Amino acid sequence: MSDYKSTLNLPETGFPMRGDLAKREPGMLARWTDDDLYGIIRAAKKGKKTFILHDGPPYANGSIHIGHSVNKILKDIIVKSKGLSGFDSPYVPGWDCHGLPIELKVEQEFGKPGEKFTAAEFRAKCREYAATQVDGQRKDFIRLGVLGDWSHPYLTMDFKTEANIIRALGRIIKNGHLHKGAKPVHWCVDCRSALAEAEVEYYDKTSPSIDVAFRAVDQDAVKAKFGLPGVSGPVSLVIWTTTPWTLPANRAISLAPDFDYALVQIDGQAVILAKDLVESVMQRIGAAEYTILGTVKGAELELLRFTHPFMGFDVPAILGDHVTLDAGTGAVHTAPGHGPDDYVIGQKYGLETANPVGPDGAYLPGTYPTLDGVNVFKANDIVIELLKEKGALLHVEKMQHSYPCCWRHKTPIIFRATPQWFVSMDKEGLRQQSLKEIKGVQWIPDWGQARIESMVANRPDWCISRQRTWGVPMSLFVHKETQELLPIERTLAAMEEVAKRVEVDGIQAWWDLDPKEILGEDADQYEKVPDTLDVWFDSGSTSYSVVDARPEFAGHAADMYLEGSDQHRGWFMSSLMISVAMKGKAPYRQVLTHGFTVDGQGRKMSKSIGNTVSPQDVMNKLGADILRLWVASTDYTGEMAVSDEILKRAADSYRRIRNTARFLLANLNGFNPATDMVKPEEMVVLDRWAVGCAKTAQQEILKAYEAYDFHEVVQRLMRFCSVEMGSFYLDIIKDRQYTAKADSVARRSCQTALYHIAEALVRWMAPIMSFTADEIWGYLLGEREKYVFTGEWYDGLFGLEENEEFNDAFWDDVRYIKDQINKELENQKANGIKSNLEAKVTLKYADDANGTIKKLKLLGEEVRFIFITSQFVISEQAGGIDDENIQYNAGNTTVQAVVTRAEGDKCPRCWHYTTDVGKVAEHADICGRCVSNIAGNGEQRKFA
């Protein structure tokens, strides 16, 4: 017997079966860097329509975690897919470099500013620390395969950016949005600084819950309001609070104007509280017997005065819309220095904004003898004892409730009125204009719109001043006596002068500045404001300080901001506020948010639980492309689950896609697209169907990329590789590829299809599996650019026409019939028919057969290649189908498949069973078809 292996067209490629990504990817990255791939892409896309995804700056502190990876990979997928869609999509990564976390790190190592180092030296240490953090994070982001201008990122501590942040504040001042006030702000006593909304987290805390009686100053006047002069005992208004430490700052009691308030007689006294809460309050204070003497509307009690239980002054009853019946007594303890609602109502009534608490959280001297110098959280017990002594405490109990805490220290914070600078939400219509602008933005997912609308509608003025060392200075001058801001025109001119100096020397230029250099003779009357800007102002102003300033953005506004869902109250909010305050318009056209990462059981990532997934570990074990594929295949609109098992599934999907690509490349062995391409009209019908299948898949994949629906991209890609190609087309063509004459139309037609499919597939993969796409690109044939990322989606696909006889609908039916026959072939393994090629299939049909069955007959001898059997007979069954073997419906036609053993002998070359093996003397071992392919003109294929 001759060895016919050398006569076969066996697949061959240098593209490895195993990805071995962890080892190969670093080498590819080195080539990308050496070639300046990002620069090559920018040059290739020059002059195209722009798409700008503006990078929200991560904080320059610590190693990147899995959430960072999700964020950067999603951005990279979008930027690369936009490039393939014909856009010039520059990506400039950034970092947030000022602020408290960096200060704390430097303090831990070197001490507080002014101890071992001057403030100037401390800032230099902070700058140095931030730079090292940026370098560390940058290496990891690059390792993820994220393409961007990593050599020229933006840092909020860049001198030019710092200067532009000052200029942004100047524009906001010019537009009338800045004001100064002693308003209550979130205050962390550990940071000794105000906190932004986005720096506040909520945790459960146990606090004392107390009911306190404020005795009426004019008892008769209060009784008269209820028309009950003969009430027994004193009358008091009862408040409820969970922050007893704020009582020294109480300046009023708020009532709802339309609620009914009851005068209730209990043991030897009468108390006033909301009628609807009488029963719950009486149960709470243990009053088994009580009588409601009368009721009046809250409005009737306005401006009646009540004695503070221990502070020695009286306070008014006032009316406010913030009073509810959800809990308490319906009478709200009001301390304008310790709460935003209290402050607003206090302004309306001209109340004092009292703040008896220092920056360290201790009462200031002169507050109250037993409270002076005591930390407010330790003062609750002292206040409760005071109330007991004064006979004003009706009830005390412990309750657990959600309480605001510092994001950095995880410790409870307080509201504390301090002199601060604010961006006003309403003075110049910032709130209304922002709400208007929100409606013009596309929010993805769409629930993001309602979320940020609610936040903007309800947020207080934005406190932008901080009492920190490492931050952009506000660069303002105020009068030493009046504390009034330098006149507006002079303020703006002075700020520009400061900005010019900062542009050269950084923020230290402000602290080194002698006011005389700018203010001249007036310097004696004015002093520099020592405050720095909230870091959310730094990052929030990047639409101006970065996007407007970078030449590659060419004056275009950002098309997209993309961050985690917590940024509605963070970067999306601050960016919106600043852009609208400066320019009257939103800084973005689209805002996309992704969920947080959780483990396989849906639990939050936590080092203490030990369920964190390190992106560095994943890249070192599996490779970045597996991490990228996991991100793309996960629905980012909700929580994103990740675990070793989930990543293993991503690796399995990756292998299926890689194997498909390898099959395509291996079977393009010996194909030259310049000389061997077959014209579409001359191709085998099945090959044209396969190219058309790729065309349909491409339309759906591009639509999904356009909608940022990346898990749909992956699902469609998998369906194409596994179902349409792997289990149908690629399986069928193996016989033709391997056994047909090497340069026959039958084989070249197939290779033409594989070439077109490979050209499309590598581009679909590129935004997601960037390393693997680059690797495949290097093995593709024909003249091409060096990198897949510089081109666009493949435009050489075509398909079958709908009016053709063997159109897509026909092949859909064929795939269905093939699936059913494969099930029967599987069943026959028990009867000794071990492989499809050992089988003969007889397809019987009734005389009412539909067009698909009749068309199958037209395929003649080629039909067996579709079903991968040695023989395939289609036979009309007179009198209908019996119930023997398998029956199923194919397009309203009942057909029956009968599987028997194939006739003849096995050909050692093609492995088909046939009755003509050995009929040609010169090739006595093989079948006639193989003889033709070796020594003759080669078999002709028209359909399959």
UniProtKB/Swiss-Prot annotation:
Chief localization: cytoplasm
Where ATP is bound, by residue? 607
Instruction: Tell me the enzyme class.
Output: ligase
Q: Which reaction does it catalyse?
A: tRNA(Ile) + L-isoleucine + ATP = L-isoleucyl-tRNA(Ile) + AMP + diphosphate
Entry keyword annotation includes Protein biosynthesis:
yes
Show where the record puts the motif 'HIGH' region: 58-68
- A Gene Ontology molecular function term of the record: aminoacyl-tRNA deacylase activity
Q: Which InterPro entries match?
A: aa-tRNA-synth_I_CS, aa-tRNA-synth_Ia, Anticodon_Ile_BEm, Ile-tRNA-ligase, Ile-tRNA-ligase_type1, Ile-tRNA_ligase, M/V/L/I-tRNA-synth_anticd-bd, Rossmann-like_a/b/a_fold
- Please give the superkingdom of this protein's source: Bacteria
Q: Where does Zn(2+) bind?
A: 907, 910, 927, 930
Provide this UniProt record's keywords sorted from A to Z: Aminoacyl-tRNA synthetase, ATP-binding, Cytoplasm, Ligase, Metal-binding, Nucleotide-binding, Protein biosynthesis, Zinc
On cofactor binding, the record's note says:
Binds 1 zinc ion per subunit.
Q: Which NCBIfam families match?
A: ileS
Family listed: Belongs to the class-I aminoacyl-tRNA synthetase family. IleS type 1 subfamily.
Q: What is this protein called?
A: Isoleucine--tRNA ligase
Gene (name only): ileS
